[in-house]
Design a protein with these regions (language model features):
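Short hydrophobic/aromatic-enriched beta-strand-loop microsegments
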Residues: 77-81, 160-166, 250
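Catalytic metal-binding/acid-base residues of hydrolase active sites
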Residues: 9, 57, 167, 200-201, ...
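Histidine-centered catalytic micro-motifs
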Residues: 3-13, 163-166
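Conserved, mostly hydrophobic/aromatic
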Residues: 7, 43, 66, 97, ...
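Mid-to-C-terminal alpha-helical segments outside catalytic/metal-binding sites
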Residues: 1-6, 16, 24-50, 218-219, ...
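Catalytic pocket-lining loop regions of alpha/beta-barrel enzymes
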Residues: 117-231, 277-279
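Short, acidic/polar
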Residues: 32-42, 87-98, 179-180
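Active-site gating/metal-coordination segments in enzymes
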Residues: 50, 59-144, 151, 194-200
């Protein structure tokens, strides 16, 4: 079984060659950066073969460090890049977006109020349409409001959407974290909506194997099936051991078959993002 992590961050410290936006958008998850080499060491120890690099918000819209990692380790990494929808040549960039080596799609985040308002004001209609037209998959961070993906899925039925961290409230845990589950399950009727089952231990109040979240994962499995669920860690933010995050999907969750585990732990993501599995 080839294990692919659907989300990690790598980044460098703020420096002249790789400046961060000022003031910083938020705080990095670790001091001193997290390099591709460090990521590989942690992946190897956890039994993870490949990972999708999602550049973090604090570096701005730059994908340079992530693309450098792909160039150095093409068998280990690919990228879902950040994208500046306000760039003067934004539409032209999209036309050749997937021509970049190792680039699989785009990750968009909706956290700050001005950005969230764009989901409703129509200012991103051109972006959704262009991504659909060019076959660019999107990862979306919607914190506790999965229903915000519904109008997009309705209007752009051929656009592939992946909802990060199960579209849960990242600052909550236990029962409070799962309050949006009914709304997330309701979106399963849209065949191009997929769910990233990432950072799962962060939403648990119990030690490994985090049995308090198993029922929620079963609901997602019943609604979406194993071909639309993608395991991930977000390792630099992860509570608990990276290896345990993998092992829970390999050894626990007794409703999963061996074929299900293979899909959720990498094959389904590889198919969705057109990142063929190779040994």
């Amino acid at each position: 079984m080839l294990v692919t992590d659907a989300q990690i961050h790598v980044w460098e410290v703020d420096r002249p060659g790789r400046p961060w936006p000022q003031p910083p958008r938020n705080q990095p998850q670790r001091e001193g950066g997290f390099s591709a080499r460090e990521a590989i060491a942690e992946m190897d120890a956890a039994g993870v073969d490949r990972a999708v690099i999602v550049p973090p918000t604090w570096v701005g819209e730059s994908n340079a460090t992530a693309l450098d990692a792909v160039e150095a380790y093409p068998d280990r990494f690919a990228v879902m890049g950040r994208f500046d929808t306000d760039a003067p040549d934004a539409e032209q960039q999209l036309a050749g977006w997937l021509d970049q080596p190792g680039m699989l799609g785009i990750r968009v985040t909706f956290i700050a109020k001005p950005r969230i308002e764009q989901l409703d004001d129509g200012s991103l209609d051109w972006f959704w349409a262009a991504c659909e037209r060019h076959g660019i998959p999107l990862m979306m961070l919607l914190r506790g409001v999965p229903e915000q993906a519904q109008p997009i899925a309705e209007r752009y039925p051929d656009l592939t959407l992946i909802l990060d961290h199960m579209a849960l409230n990242l600052s909550a845990e236990g029962a409070a974290a799962w309050e949006s589950m009914d709304r997330l399950v309701a979106l399963a009727r849209f065949p191009r909506i997929n769910v990233k089952v990432s950072s799962v231990p962060n939403f648990s109040t119990e030690p490994y194997p985090h049995r308090d979240v198993h029922g929620h994962l079963r609901r997602l499995y019943d609604a979406y099936g194993p071909r639309r669920l993608f395991w991930g860690s977000d390792v630099t933010r992860l509570r608990g051991a990276y290896r345990d995050c993998v092992r829970m999907f390999q050894e626990e969750l007794d409703f999963l078959s061996d074929a299900d585990r293979e899909l959720i732990l990498g094959r389904a993501l590889a198919d969705c993002l057109n990142w063929p599995e190779q040994r």
